[in-house]
Amino acid sequence: MNKAYSIIWSHSRQAWIVASELARGHGFVLAKNTLLVLAVVSTIGNAFAVNISGTVSSGGTVSSGETQIVYSGRGNSNATVNSGGTQIVNNGGKTTATTVNSSGSQNVGTSGATISTIVNSGGIQRVSSGGVASATNLSGGAQNIYNLGHASNTVIFSGGNQTIFSGGITDSTNISSGGQQRVSSGGVASNTTINSSGAQNILSEEGAISTHISSGGNQYISAGANATETIVNSGGFQRVNSGAVATGTVLSGGTQNVSSGGSAISTSVYNSGVQTVFAGATVTDTTVNSGGNQNISSGGIVSETTVNVSGTQNIYSGGSALSANIKGSQIVNSEGTAINTLVSDGGYQHIRNGGIASGTIVNQSGYVNISSGGYAESTIINSGGTLRVLSDGYARGTILNNSGRENVSNGGVSYNAMINTGGNQYIYSDGEATAAIVNTSGFQRINSGGTAPVQNSVVVTRTVSSAAKPFDAEVYSGGKQTVYLWRGIWYSNFLTAVWSMFPGTASGANVNLSGRLNAFAGNVVGTILNQEGRQYVYSGATATSTVGNNEGREYVLSGGITDGTVLNSGGLQAVSSGGKASATVINEGGAQFVYDGGQVTGTNIKNGGTIRVDSGASALNIALSSGGNLFTSTGATLPELTTMAALSVSQNHASNIVLENGGLLRVTSGGTATDTTVNSAGRLRIDDGGTINGTTTINADGIVAGTNIQNDGNFILNLAENYDFETELSGSGVLVKDNTGIMTYAGTLTQAQGVNVKNGGIIFDSAVVNADMAVNQNAYINISDQATINGSVNNNGSIVINNSIINGNITNDADLSFGTAKLLSATVNGSLVNNKNIILNPTKESAGNTLTVSNYTGTPGSVISLGGVLEGDNSLTDRLVVKGNTSGQSDIVYVNEDGSGGQTRDGINIISVEGNSDAEFSLKNRVVAGAYDYTLQKGNESGTDNKGWYLTSHLPTSDTRQYRPENGSYATNMALANSLFLMDLNERKQFRAMSDNTQPESASVWMKITGGISSGKLNDGQNKTTTNQFINQLGGDIYKFHAEQLGDFTLGIMGGYANAKGKTINYTSNKAARNTLDGYSVGVYGTWYQNGENATGLFAETWMQYNWFNASVKGDGLEEEKYNLNGLTASAGGGYNLNVHTWTSPEGITGEFWLQPHLQAVWMGVTPDTHQEDNGTVVQGAGKNNIQTKAGIRASWKVKSTLDKDTGRRFRPYIEANWIHNTHEFGVKMSDDSQLLSGSRNQGEIKTGIEGVITQNLSVNGGVAYQAGGHGSNAISGALGIKYSF
């Protein structure tokens, strides 16, 4: 029976699935090709039963439960699909004019195409997977476009709907009369036309492109969706919801509503079109053309709108427009805001009913009208622009540039306008302009009924008669103000930069920008002087309550009087001879100058204010606040200050003056200043012939100046930083240096009461000091090459001398040191008492300094530190030369400065004494150089000088040289590094249980642990060494080869760790040095047996190792010296194994007696790095490339006890004797001297021990060895070994 297949849409799979049932259909039925059907179904995801293929079918009805499938390049036309019926078009199938009725469906799949399908109410057309539907009519029916489906020219009406799913595409859809298009996420609709009662709902980010909305049509854009290049005609509507974006919309009479959270970009509004922006919406770059409107509601914000001619932007309560470009109209209504608007080319900005505009710029032919409570701030009117301030309008901070105009009338108010060159302000009837500033060539016109209560203008000429009282005015240079008569108010025209006032009263004048007010008589009240404005008060005139601001000046000339002037920052009052000023207040930055013959009374100088009172001037009852500045001289008269009653200047004497913040006191010739204090930025100037006494203190960054200063009191320098003091200082007083900085002095300093350095330091540079000096703790002085101190020095801090001369005694209770230069020579023409430290070697490279004193006394615990390049008698060294006597006791600390050491004969002179040599000097530290120790002795070896003190490299009262014990430590490390890892074949191979010559074991591992002690002597005859050592070596055979004719070959690897600690004692000086050595080795070895290792025959062995060590040497009183050694050692040797005798005991146990003559040669190539000790000695190894030869014989017995008769255990006791010869003796070369370990050239060695086989694979051994050579050299060691064979 033929089978048919119905198909059911699966929402979960988003595909058609097959259901089997009986089939009926029209056209060509291919029921028997069931397999083919299933194959097609499997490729396209659909099922079908009635197939149309290879022919064209016309007409036909697909009834309930039937499926018609159209495929394979043929088609069907005029089919009718009724309720429950399905038509499937795919795989090249094509249908035309299909009618799909209620509950019928047409499915267009891969490569299927339909044209002019009619889908009635309840019917559905599905287009997916490469299917194409063209010119479908949805008369109440539905069309769904799925992924890769495409529909074009669909017509939707009578409640029909089109849904575009992700990946679906539609083009040129026409929607009308209740039709609806829904663009789901991922779907795309382009060129859709929406007619009356049609609707498009957009939910896709890809959205709708080039939609055309006619009258009555609606487009709704939802969150996350986009609509691009939509055209909305008259009566059409576009709604942009929260999260949606509309870009490039054209409103050609239609409406766009942008809701909260919605965004519209680059909208164009034409004739009768309206864009409405609601709260929370964002709209940018809208263009409003002729007849178009942009309405901004409460909370809405738009930016960069362009309004062209006859277009309108309406800003309602709470709405805001930013950076609009207005060539049409902008209307700012109640509580609306416009910011940074540009108005030009016939554009109007209307600000009314409480609207606000800020930062508007008005260019050529632009207009701004402010009325009915409107407010505009910071408007800029450029050339050709106009601002009108009308009834109840208010403009603040308007800037009028060249040819810009502001009209104020009918109750309008302009405040603080700035009228620049060419700018114009017109004030008409009932208009008011307050606080305008009219700059150069600006113009302000006040017409009849206009008011300008506080006039900022550029006034040039003003004449005030005795009966007149002018308005307040600010006076600038070059401008013009014209005031016309209204209701009897006077008028005047100001044309010059001079305002002259004759008998009468003027008040409230403002004089600016080089303007000038001349008061020849009468009273001037309340003048304000700004920006280089000037007021001159002549004889007969009085100025009261003047205020001097930045660069404002008031000049009080002879006969002129001022009262109550206030001088602010930059303001100045100058009182000339015959002028008088009273009650002047000087604030921060203000200044009052009182010249010779001028008089001021009651001046109040605040913090930061300045008063200058010249010689011949007087300042009475002045009040100088803290931080106020006083400039005066001893020739002025300042009898007292109300705040400091003790301060006075009169009759060439100033007392208790405090100078700060620029304050100046000049002490003139013959004048005296007593108890002067100079604080930060204060200045004290002392002319030649002027004197300071009492306590003069210079603090912080205060300044004292003068070429010859006479100080008869306490002169205290307490400055904050380092400074130079380049003046002559004389007098009967004392100079006290009390700040932490450094003072550099060059000149002649004479102070009868001395110089006291309490803190910081003084550098005397080319100075002559005629005074006793005291250097306190934490203070210092540096006496340079060219400086001379004529006086005693008491040092509790630090003194640095160079090529200096001190003509006086020194008591040193701290540090007296040379500078860091080389070969310095200082002279003390007086006695030196040393209670602490004298340092002649401040660096490790300063050898050669000489200190010459008249007499020297040392107290117990005192130290003299010297240095030198230690070699022989002529070593370069620091020296103390005493022209007179020495007494007391001092320690000597001597430092070798990279000297290589050498043998001395007469000694190295470090202290020379010409008088009585009663002082005792002793070395406090150990002095070494090269291979030698140095000692200190009084007198030289030849006996020609029994007063001086000498360093010698021989033992006291003996010609024997003192060799350092470090020689032995270095030599021992050298020897050990080359010998610790030595071994021979017997120490490595171990005894085996096998006695035949079968194939040897395939591999083995072994370990040897050795401990021992060795001792020896150096060839200097003074130093003996003792060393303990520990060695752990392990290895293993990694390759074995056996050949009947060639013998047995073995290759192995080995490594080891060793450490040693030793001590060398010099038995002549009792000084000692300790050495340590630890390191590692890695190497390879090889052996050959002629007939196997347990048979009679020849054998040979060789090995090579790389060794590296860390070493140290620590001598008594010296720094620990650390260095490295590394290098190769290699060995070659051989011998003959001989079974001398074999026997069998009564118990049946076999024993053997063996002899083994052998020979071994070892090359030793481990060397140390060249090392320089802390004292400069260069250390190198001696005995490099030594070849050690060992020849000997070994006897052994293979035995087994009766207890072990039936086991594999066997033992081999042995004894061995060797002769050892070394081609070189190991040692050390320290600078140019070499010391060797004696007795190591030829040595004898005895070994004994036992080897045992525990199991077939495990063997152990133990033994002791003793070596002995000449000069008492010997070594004893014990070893344990273990070997495991595989």
Swiss-Prot record:
It holds the Pfam family ESPR. Keywords: Autocatalytic cleavage, Cell adhesion, Cell outer membrane, Glycoprotein, Membrane, Periplasm, Plasmid, Secreted, Signal, Transmembrane, Transmembrane beta strand, Virulence. Residues 998-1286 form the Autotransporter domain. Changing residue 785 to A: No effect on autocleavage. Glycans are attached at residues 102, 111, 116, 154, 242, 252, 334, 391, 409, 539, 545, 558, 569, 576-577, 582. InterPro entries: AC_1, AIDA, Autotransporte_beta, Autotransporte_beta_dom_sf, Autotransporter_Adhesin, Autotransporter_pectin_lyase_C, Bact_Autotransporter_VF, ESPR. GO terms for cellular component: cell outer membrane; cell surface; extracellular region; periplasmic space. The keyword Glycoprotein applies. Residues 1013-1029, 1059-1079, 1109-1126, 1165-1186, 1222-1242, 1268-1275 are extracellular. Residues 1-49 form the signal peptide. The record marks 846-847 as: Cleavage. Glycosylated on serine residues by AHH and AAH2 in the cytoplasm. Glycosylated with an average of 19 heptose residues. Glycosylated with either ADP-L, D-heptose or ADP-D, D-heptose. Glycosylation is required for protein folding/stabilization and resistance to protease-mediated degradation. Glycosylation is required for bacteria adhesion to mammalian cells. Glycosylation is dispensable for cell outer membrane localization. Glycosylation is dispensable for AIDA-mediated cell-cell aggregation and induction of biofilm formation. Glycosylation is dispensable for interaction with Ag43. Changing residue 712 to A: No effect on autocleavage. Intercellular AIDA-AIDA interaction is responsible for bacterial autoaggregation. AIDA can also interact with antigen 43 (Ag43), and the resultant intercellular AIDA-Ag43 interaction causes cell aggregation. This is Autotransporter adhesin AIDA-I. The lineage of its organism: Bacteria, Pseudomonadati, Pseudomonadota, Gammaproteobacteria, Enterobacterales. The gene is aidA.
